[in-house]
Amino acid sequence: PEQRLTATGFLALGPKILNERDKETFQMELVDEQIDATSRAVLGLTVSCARCHDHKFDPIGMKDYYALAGIFTSTRTLFGTKNGGGNRQASGLMPIGEDSAELAQQRQTHAKKLAAAQKKLASSTKQLQKIKKRPAKPNKSSKGPDMDEMRRKVAELKAEIGKLRKNAPPAPDYAMGVSDSGASADCRIRLRGDPKKRGPVVERGYLPIIAIDSAPEIAKEESGRKQFAAWLVNKDNPLAARVMVNRLWHHLFGTGIVRTVDNFGKMGEAPVHQELLDYLAVRAIEHDWSVKKMIREIMLSRTYQLSSDHHAGNYEMDPGNRHNWQMSHRRLDAEAIRDAILFASGDLDPEPFQGSVIQQLGDVNFGRQIRDLGGRGAEVKRHRSVYQPILR
């Protein structure tokens, strides 16, 4: 369950205009980014183009866009930031783990007690300062019972705050992610994409250009995100599996079977080998969408194991190697080079890194803490690059 919750972080990781003052504008920009990322990554479609108006020759219209928007406006995005430093859109994080709900409740109760004590301390300290500044009367000491009582109260509150901080309940594990907002509702069309110019309500739903007879219905009290996910990976959905395996092919060979990996629409390129794409898509579904199994199957194929030797006859017929008669030279990414060097030198630790270096720094301005991050990241340096801390 924790892995499934953490996987929803895909919807929380995108760029955000955190200094946006208007909450509705911020929400609609966030929703647009989520629709754009999901439609491109999973379907290979540019759905976000329909946010402002219909396009004459585009089968995806504004109603389709806002049918999806209703799903995401009914979803709460937890990306974990605090107000301050130009950020006007605070957000919590999602507690995960067996005791996460109980621990989160304990932390919330404790935080309220601590905040109340700090408020009392601030008020008492202010009163004490007023007493100190009070004009002294002739032949009388300014140190009266009022000052003694207030000093005692301030000392007690400081001791209470110290005790609360010392005995804080343990924090649960947290992750970025999304959950249902609890206030699910259909979305109104925003005329010309302006959050303040509202049009008619559009019922939550899916893209009609992908007709699936067994598409799950969205209950009024739910966001529809779960049903949307089921619709995306439905075996009758012609795009999701093809887009997935095409991305894997692109990563392994340097070029996808469809070269425009983010665009399977009319403006994208046609697949160079439709039958191969269909076959791999079927195999992905049979493998229960396992990326590891698909990578293994492709890498064990004769095509992947071809050499990069030149062949004059093949080159004359297919100079771009679109039909994979040889293994194309391709640039290795920096992470793979780093891991290879560590492995060859015997310094690579193959075990998964435990914990989070960024979590050790807490909620800070990373621009000023970058040196601390480098120093604290020493224990990660022998692990694979996938575990290196990335600042977003």
Model-derived regions: residue spans:
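Sequence context surrounding c-type heme c attachment/ligation sites in exported
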Residues: 3-111
